[in-house]
Amino acid sequence: MKEKKRKKKRVIPGFGLSFGITIAMLGFIVVIPLCTLVIFSAKLSFTEFITTVTRPRVLSSYRVSLQTALIAALIDAVMGTILAWVLVRYNFPGKQIMNGIIELPFALPTAVAGIALTHLTTTNGWLGAFFGKFGIRIAYTRLGIIFALIFVGIPFVVRAVQPVLEKVDIQYEEAANMLGATNRQTVFRVILPEILPALIGGFTMSFARGLGEYGSVVFIAGNTPYETEIAPLMIMSKLQEYDYASATSIALVMLFIAFIILFINAVLQSRTCLLYTSDAADDLIGVD
């Protein structure tokens, strides 16, 4: 007689209970608040909704948020990758301290970060005074917004790329150099394919964080309409005016943009993984 297979005792409850808890948490934390947002927006007719979200000042705030968040995320992608590389490949005094400081923007209240960055970049601050000699203003300009978004976004890239770099065997780089590859070829043909999915993920999270950032930006931006006024500030202004329908309408557009960004991120990451997996397989076949 065949022995009946015994079911493995699982530490975590079975699929039914686990799935039910997951759906309940997802519903209370994510779905219900989003549905509330849609319900408040529904108080406006379709024409009123379109009029609200396409006013020149609102469109300008979208443009400022998108442009500054994109530029900051691109800079984060470059600087974050370099920082991750230094932390993984080199040993130096204070390495652990630097590794901990990178996570400071995660723990620091955004309002505190905004006040600190503003004092640093005004004409009386260290950075502001230095760049002021060259006629460059940071505080109360879009450059200040980008500076703040770089500060809050760079940990996303570093923490996404760092663990992947730790898994990349340095022998691959040594083998590439022995085969005559230049440093540039080693970076783009050996290292970049390994870290690209993580880099895309870190860039996207930095971009998404920048779009919704309020606390660290509101102090340094100056909040000049059509110049440095961001979309989250427009939402807050509408709430202070008790215009909840307009506030939720503007927020709904931002939510839609965030969903698009995350969807594109998922598609790019999956295609990138498939692309470089197939390339690696072709290389192995060629070697054989």
Language-model features and meaning:
Residues 10-45, 54-166, 190-215, 236-240, ...:
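Membrane-water interface segments at the C-terminal ends of transmembrane alpha-helices
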Residues 220-225:
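Juxtamembrane non-transmembrane "cap" segments at the membrane-aqueous interface
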Residues 1-11:
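Short, Lys/Arg-rich, polar N-terminal cytosolic tail immediately upstream
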Residues 179-180, 193:
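Glycine/proline-centered hinge or cleavage motifs at structural transition points of membrane proteins
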Residues 276-281:
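Conserved small/polar residues in nucleotide/adenosyl-binding loops
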Residues 162-174, 182-183:
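Membrane-helix/interface signature in polytopic inner-membrane proteins
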